[in-house]
Amino acid sequence: MSPRKTYILKLYVAGNTPNSMRALKTLRNILETEFKGVYALKVIDVLKNPQLAEEDKILATPTLSKILPPPVRRIIGDLSDRERVLIGLDLLYDELVDNDLNSSLMDALGVPDIEEADS
């Protein structure tokens, strides 16, 4: 089994508004559930650090950026839909591809599926 990738993410928020806090809470829940121990999240308050928002061309908050692994992906706005966040950042796709690769490798090696082994 290959080592899991490390995910680097940035969440841009505008102060401690309810929308910002909800985005952060939802995102942390997703990351702790799906990527525990293999992610780094940097929260950037664009009101306190407008230069960082300008450098990264952030025009709206909340904005979530996946920096690593490439390609860079962004989601702007509502982060409450877990599947939308994972698909939008190519995180769900990465997990599906890893599972498909494992399945293809097992097929190539002639290892039967669990259902076949029981019959």
Swiss-Prot record:
GO terms (BP aspect): circadian rhythm
Database matches in InterPro entries: Circ_KaiB, KaiB-like, KaiB_domain, Thioredoxin-like_sf
Keywords: Biological rhythms
UniProt KW Zinc-finger keyword: no
Pfam families assigned to the protein according to its UniProt record, in alphabetical order: KaiB
Role according to the record: Key component of the KaiABC oscillator complex, which constitutes the main circadian regulator in cyanobacteria. Complex composition changes during the circadian cycle to control KaiC phosphorylation. KaiA stimulates KaiC autophosphorylation, while KaiB sequesters KaiA, leading to KaiC autodephosphorylation. Phospho-Ser-431 KaiC accumulation triggers binding of KaiB to form the KaiB(6):KaiC(6) complex, leading to changes in output regulators CikA and SasA. KaiB switches to a thioredoxin-like fold (KaiB(fs)) when bound to KaiC.
Family: Belongs to the KaiB family.
Subunit structure: The KaiABC complex composition changes during the circadian cycle to control KaiC phosphorylation. Complexes KaiC(6), KaiA(2-4):KaiC(6), KaiB(6):KaiC(6) and KaiC(6):KaiB(6):KaiA(12) are among the most important forms, many form cooperatively. Undergoes a major conformational rearrangment; in the free state forms homotetramers as a dimer of dimers. When bound to the CI domain of KaiC switches to a monomeric thioredoxin-fold (KaiB(fs)). KaiB(fs) binds CikA, leading it to dephosphorylate phospho-RpaA.
Domain note: Has 2 forms, fold switches to a thioredoxin-like fold (KaiB(fs)) when bound to KaiC.
Name of the protein in its database record: Circadian clock oscillator protein KaiB
Organism field: Synechococcus sp. (strain CC9311)
The encoding gene: kaiB
